[in-house]
Design a protein with these regions (language model features):
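Glycine-rich nucleotide-binding loop
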Residues: 267-269
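Short, solvent-exposed loop/turn segments at secondary-structure boundaries
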Residues: 22-23, 48, 83-86
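Active-site-proximal alpha-helical scaffold in enzymes
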Residues: 88-103
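Short, flexible loop/turn motifs enriched in small residues
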Residues: 28
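Short aromatic/hydrophobic contact patches that present stacked aromatics
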Residues: 83, 271-273
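C-terminal nucleotide
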Residues: 1-12, 16-17, 25, 33-66, ...
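Short, conserved phosphate/pyrophosphate- and ester-handling motifs at nucleotide-, phospho-/glycolipid
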Residues: 87, 265
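N-terminal pre-triad scaffold of radical SAM enzymes
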Residues: 72-81
């Protein structure tokens, strides 16, 4: 039995979504796959599931009743620590495999279970990564339900309403700094700033407004406006303390051949995303600045079993 799930790009709204603001994401065509077969004891890639690198897999196993121990094989094309939802993709693919062994998979159930896994492992978190990996395509997260509601997730008096949103087919250039940063501490540091710094709290609210304006610009195919909003979103994320000199270097390099660029994901390293109609030139610009660059495209398929 096997299942796969996509990585994700947050186009607008990372960190602000934790505080109930809007965020916009899309699944991308880099996927994680998890294969399972019966075995005398639980194993992951031949090793113990107690190894720290399998903490998401182990927490996912605890969510699903299985008939017995399994040998799991994890294959992921989503680079770890790059801000592209690698842990969410592996978590969702693991849950998809485990549920699939019972007969069928349900994206809503898996999205909720995967969010609980990430919350347990990371601490304070939002469901945007795990819901995008579960549903595929474009997702808009709002504090209140509107049209095209997929599901609602609640935790600790907070509520996120996940909506399907139709985005035009888009290619994005990713610039990976090669610097990894743990999501949990970054989220905790932003929380501390927002609770004690009025400017940080206002930045979070502005990011929420930018997200809705950015969605409108993308729907109108106004890439110039969308790029400007990405640039502003990056500046606000830097104000929240999740920037890094290498992120700024790659953003500046990418902007010379694109409509706009910003960090994507938790920050502190990881990746930048650029909106460009000259992707080959943007890739070269990022590489010249010291980053690893590649092009991804939106993926409409979420969690799915493999034949």
């Amino acid at each position: 039995m096997a299942a796969s799930a996509p990585g994700k790009l947050i186009l607008f709204g990372e960190h602000a979504v934790v505080f109930g603001e809007a965020a916009l994401s899309t699944a991308i065509n880099l996927r994680a796959e998890v294969y399972a077969r019966p075995h005398p004891e639980w194993r992951a890639d031949g090793g113990s599931i107690d190894e720290p690198r399998y903490r998401y897999v182990k927490a996912a196993i605890a969510k699903v009743a299985t008939t017995g121990p399994l040998w799991l094989e994890v294959r992921s094309m989503v680079p770890s620590g790059a801000g592209l939802g690698s842990s969410a993709a592996v978590t969702v693919a693991t849950l998809g495999t485990l549920h699939g062994m019972g007969g069928s998979i349900d994206a809503k159930t898996i999205a909720r279970e995967a969010f609980e896994v990430e919350h347990e492992v990371q601490g304070r978190a939002s469901p945007i990564d795990t819901s995008t990996a579960s549903a595929g395509g474009g997702l808009l997260v709002l504090p209140k339900p509107q049209g095209d509601l997929l599901w609602t997730i609640e935790r600790d008096a907070r509520r996120w309403c996940l909506h399907r949103t139709n985005l035009p087919p888009l290619d994005f250039v990713i610039g990976n700094t090669g610097i990894s940063a743990a999501t949990g501490p970054l989220v905790a540091n932003v929380k501390e700033r927002v609770e004690h710094d009025r400017k940080a709290a206002e930045a979070v609210r502005e990011i929420g407004r930018i997200t809705l304006d950015g969605l409108d610009a993308l729907r109108r195919n106004d890439l110039v406006a969308a790029g400007r909003l990405m640039d502003r979103n990056h500046a606000l994320l830097t104000l929240l303390g999740v920037g890094h000199p290498m992120l700024d270097r790659l953003v500046q390099a990418a902007r010379r051949t694109s409509y706009g660029a910003k960090l994507t994901g938790a920050g502190g390293g990881g990746s930048v995303v650029a909106l460009s109609d000259r992707p080959a030139e943007t890739v070269e610009a990022i590489r010249a600045a010291g980053g690893k660059a590649f092009v991804v495209r939106s993926d409409p398929i979420g969690v799915a079993t493999l034949s």
